[in-house]
Amino acid sequence: MGKHIKLRLIVMNILQWAIWGAYLTSMGNYLVQVGLGPKIGLFYAMQGIVSIFMPALMGIVADKWLGATKTLALCQFIAGAAMLGAGLYAASVESGAIAAGMKVAEMFSFPLFMSLYTISVAFYMPTIALSNSAAYGILEQNGYDTVKDFPPIRVFGTVGFIASMWIMNFCKTSAGTSFQFTYHQFIISGVIGLVLVLYCFTLPKIKKAETQGQSLMDALGLSAFKLFRDKQMAIFFIFSMLLGVALQITNGYATPFISHFQGLPEFAESWGAKNATAIYSISQIAETLGILLIPFAMKKFGIKNVMLIAMLAWVLRFGLFGLGDTGSGVWMLILSCIVYGVAFDFFNISGSLYVNERTSGSVQNSAQGLFMLMTNGIGATVGTLSAQAIVNHFTYSETVMVNGEEMVFTMGDWSTCWYIFAGYALVVAILFFILFKAPAKDAPKLV
């Protein structure tokens, strides 16, 4: 029975993360094709905006009324249906454009597509926490230790994410175009989401626990703002927001950047230029491995140095993209993806652990909510919108013939964009080194 429960949760995690992996890193390539390249930042910023309040709201729904599993199914149904609708709309526009002899970009409605996308991500983002809560509840009811038994199950979520990325990269339309450039990524994401809805109803029921009536202020992390009275905690949260700026930049712009080498004659036939999503998937593999380094790093270096390593890793992440190409410089793109494991994990997970160690009592959950608000909410939103302005300033859209088919790429001075991002991360790292002082091991917890 035990292995059976774990296997069922593994399947749930594979589906949960395959939904996101289908479009998160390749959506930029599609948006460029339909004339929305200059608006890539808006799509990724929307994920940050809805992350500010939707997970908290749906968490309250789960706690007070439906429970984690049913709320997960409800959210996935709305998210999956909206994403499927976005994909089917995009497919209909493409068919209409071909019939009318027009370009897809000339017929594409940004407001309609963006509305469907927004509904989808608004209800998908809460499912990340809800799927974790459902897994915790099922494991605990069956006598498992969540700290020990959940991480190996969660790893399969990353496997699902990577599998979706590879499907988008290597599957092609009848015309030979990779799914990373087409609407198929949204349809596949929506279908997987609806499959997960059905799967949720087969999961074991979780006994409803007595709730402590967490308020919306607590769920959003707003009640934890009193922690700003502690100078070093305030500095930590401010720098969490400043580094959060970097989190979604490469998700939005890495694949359009790598793909643009197809528009340069000297790189047009290189494997890397044609397989941007596959190259980028190395980042997700590195992220999984990076988690394993955290316990050692935290013990060896302490929170300040681990966070500093993460910031310097972001400098390398961006700088290597600025130096690399898909020819002889492809190793720099690969190294950048490997570095991502340290850049992401050493910041996100170590930061969360630090918040947990420094707080106690009723403020602990709110403090975690505040950390998420500062990083994935405010920081990521500001970061993607700022990146959009920078990329739009230094690049332009250009139509190129690839294997007899018109393709649109974002051409221009990409290197300067990456150097600006790297410079920003370096300035943040230097200021963090100067201003943040790690508390003593015996420092009292904040309440």
Feature roles, as predicted:
Residues 170-191, 389-425:
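A membrane-interface helix-boundary motif in multi-pass transporters
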Residues 57, 86-91, 192-205, 407, ...:
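Multi-pass alpha-helical transporter architecture, strongest
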Residues 1-3, 204-237, 263-268:
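Juxtamembrane intracellular "pre-TM" segments in multi-pass secondary transporters
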Residues 63-77, 299-311:
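Cytoplasmic membrane-interface "Motif A"-like loop-to-helix N-cap segments
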Residues 42-63, 278-294:
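Central cavity-lining transmembrane alpha-helices of secondary-active solute carriers
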Residues 77-107, 312-326:
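C-terminal ends and interior cores of transmembrane alpha-helices
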Residues 1-52, 232-265, 275-276, 348:
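Helix-loop boundary and gating motifs at the non-cytosolic
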Residues 118-156:
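Cytoplasmic helix-loop-helix junction between adjacent transmembrane helices
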